[in-house]
Amino acid sequence: MHYTTAAEAVKLIRSNDSVYIQGSTSIPEALVAAMAERGGELEHVTVYSAFAVGAFDAPYCRPEYKESFLVNSLFVANNIRRWLADGYGQTIPAFLGEIPALFRDGTLPLDVALINVSPPDAEGYCSFGVSADLAVSAVECAKTIIAQVNRAMPYSYGDAVIHVSRLAAAVEVDSPLVEVPTAVPSETERKIGSYIAELIPDGATLQIGVGGIPNAVLAALGGHRHLGLHTEAMTDGVLPLLESGVIDNSQKAVMPGMTVASLALGSRRLYDYMDYRKDLVMKDVAWTNDPFRIRQNPKVMAINSAVEVDLTGQVCADSVGMRIISGVGGQHDFMYGGALSEGGKTFIAIPSTTPKGESKIRALLSPGAGVVTTRHMVQHVVTEYGVAHLRGRNLAERARALIAVAHPSVREELERAAAGRFGYSFLRLKA
């Protein structure tokens, strides 16, 4: 395969093109930096940026490039949050699993895809490694594919491969992948994790996210048997369960025996575990996040988080008031699929307060807050004070259950709000 420089490769990008940039822990940094260097000669290039982690700043968002690059974020992450807050870009609200369809049906047309892949195997196939998610559909739809071929990228199977013949240009690098440190659960998070673990049966299929609470849940599952993993994001937290055989995927209906994910957010240990592993597949996020595929697995345990929850069970997970801080991701997809799964359960797991001491359970969502998961599919809300069981309960009963797991300092205030809203039907319920 012929390699070129990043500066030469991005000359394939022209004014008025639309460009997809691969995200998660797999940003093709050399290509993105080289594209930004061309800012002075490019005009009206539409950039679709995906979820991203790490310290890499998004240079194309800078004010001096406001006429060069028109930024549409598919998931607001740290690298572009401040630029979007200042008006140098916008976000497209969409379920993560829906975005591939937006590429495929031309709603979001793509001229160029900038991707980060492994070196080719003996048959000429490179792997997306840690990030299949949106990259699979992006390279399917883009007219021009420019690849950063990274020696540090693990080779994963599933949908995550592309033949070198499809690459318009390739740049060879040996650049460490972004690593996401394992979050050590706090005492509060360990309590929440233990409550959830008690409700997970043997033979369950897990969908679990990133952070202290998910890690606390996983750490509490060592005594379980025959768990499965069908998730959007895979982290280091699953490794002990995979290596000990607690997760053996034997009871899954969809790809039994296989660990299924769409992206990986972890350490080098996780990436090395993935390398050429035949019992692990990285899939198009439209496939992993399809609620009607998710529901086919037995006992799906969908475990997600929130910015805030109101007294009826509505969940805001992507904004603080009007300020967008992340994206919908796959929360709705897995909460829906989990609710439909035979024996499935859905959880919203949150500490009762923010680091500033503000309650995360509120009478009403903050003005401007978006509802990511509706009250109709939230079955359990878990804090360090216990589990609010919401499934099948009326609104007044939900309010009483949620107040019981709110921080004690706000319960009286929430009781007054609930009494004013629901009247006698709330007051008759015992605290």
Locate each region found by the language model.
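Conserved alpha/beta enzyme-core scaffold
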Residues: 1-431
